[in-house]
Amino acid sequence: MANIKSQEKRIRTNERRRLRNQSVKSSLRTAVRGFREALDAGDKDKAAELLVATSRKLDKAASKGVIHKNQAANKKSALSVALNKL
């Protein structure tokens, strides 16, 4: 346990951020999974719709600092390449 008051606050803050990050990352994984399932099913219209939603979630996560902006860009690029191959 921390002896310093500021460190006690950092522990609380880190826990709140960890829970938020965990939730955001989970929803990202779910969105990407849904997109990939639509690709596997061969449903190009649904996949295109899900790509927009997934890209939005990736951008939001990057702006919140949950993931790095380059990671978001790389994932968006890979997903759009996968859609274009369909």
From Swiss-Prot:
The keyword Ribosomal protein applies. GO terms for molecular function: small ribosomal subunit rRNA binding; structural constituent of ribosome. Residues 1-16 have a biased composition (Basic and acidic residues). InterPro entries: Ribosomal_bS20, Ribosomal_bS20_sf. GO terms for cellular component: cytosol; small ribosomal subunit. Residues 1-25 are annotated as: Disordered. Keywords: Ribonucleoprotein, Ribosomal protein, RNA-binding, rRNA-binding. One of its GO terms (biological process) is translation. Binds directly to 16S ribosomal RNA. NCBIfam families: S20. Belongs to the bacterial ribosomal protein bS20 family. HAMAP family: Ribosomal_bS20. This is Small ribosomal subunit protein bS20. The gene is rpsT.
